[in-house]
């Protein structure tokens, strides 16, 4: 089982923690992680784009000019796709961009992303994050002591309002509960800062 250092909120190492090998110690599968990110980004697309076709555009019921004798090209409607203000041929219509991905493959992608963070040394486990009231300065100080200088995903066991409200004001820091972690967020942040209880929750849910 992989072991990583366990830190307190002062940035000092207070021990080590063993991680579940089936979640944090597998060989990262880049292809599956890529597939998971593409699937997730596709699911976020609203797909509400819409243009009007010949049957939907208003007006154009009257023939612009007579069929013959004007010297101009024949025209049956002023809403032809060839005309300015006319309909659109084969334009975008509302659709769902969701891509199906088997549950086992999604789990493999998540485990690969977590294992990749462990391998690269970008997983930081904290014994606890406890605050009496929301205070951005406190969370910023903790991250600074942990030497987190870039984008970080802050994972707690459950939704902790004090931690979430404190962390969401810091640029590049995204708080999330353990059951809500996903491949895109893990890969999109340089560091993964996770509490000891959140590690147990992840291992319980995704093992």
Swiss-Prot record:
What are the boundaries of the region Disordered? 49-79
- Presence of keyword RNA-binding: yes
A single GO molecular-function term is: structural constituent of ribosome
What's one GO-annotated cellular component? Answer: ribonucleoprotein complex
UniProt GO BP:
translation
Pfam families reported for this sequence: Ribosomal_L4
Keywords carried by this UniProt record:
Ribonucleoprotein, Ribosomal protein, RNA-binding, rRNA-binding
Q: Which residues cross the membrane?
A: none
What functional role does this protein have?
One of the primary rRNA binding proteins, this protein initially binds near the 5'-end of the 23S rRNA. It is important during the early stages of 50S assembly. It makes multiple contacts with different domains of the 23S rRNA in the assembled 50S subunit and ribosome. Forms part of the polypeptide exit tunnel.
Q: Which family does it belong to?
A: Belongs to the universal ribosomal protein uL4 family.
How this chain assembles, per its entry, is: Part of the 50S ribosomal subunit.
Q: Which NCBIfam families match?
A: rplD_bact (TIGR03953)
Name-wise, this protein is Large ribosomal subunit protein uL4
**What organism is the protein native to?**
Heliobacterium modesticaldum (strain ATCC 51547 / Ice1)
The gene from which this protein is expressed is: rplD
């Amino acid at each position: 089982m992989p072991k990583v250092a366990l830190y307190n909120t002062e940035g000092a190492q207070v021990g080590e923690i063993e991680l579940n090998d089936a979640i944090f110690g597998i060989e990262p599968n880049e292809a599956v992680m890529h597939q998971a990110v593409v699937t997730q980004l596709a699911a976020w697309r609203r797909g509400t784009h819409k243009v009007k076709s010949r049957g939907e555009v208003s007006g154009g019921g009257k023939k612009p000019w007579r069929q013959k004798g004007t010297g101009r090209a024949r025209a049956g409607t002023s809403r032809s796709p060839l005309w300015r203000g006319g309909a659109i041929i084969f334009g975008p219509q509302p659709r769902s961009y969701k891509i199906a991905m088997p549950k086992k493959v999604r789990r493999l992608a998540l485990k690969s992303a977590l294992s990749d963070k462990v391998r690269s040394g970008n997983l930081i486990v904290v014994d606890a994050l406890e605050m009496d009231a929301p205070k951005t300065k406190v969370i910023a100080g903790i991250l600074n002591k942990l030497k987190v200088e870039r984008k970080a995903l802050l994972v707690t066991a459950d939704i902790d309002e004090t931690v979430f409200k404190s962390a969401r004001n810091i640029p590049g820091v995204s708080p999330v509960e353990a059951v809500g972690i996903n491949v895109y967020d893990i890969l999109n942040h340089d560091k993964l800062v996770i509490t000891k209880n959140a590690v147990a929750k992840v291992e319980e849910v995704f093992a």
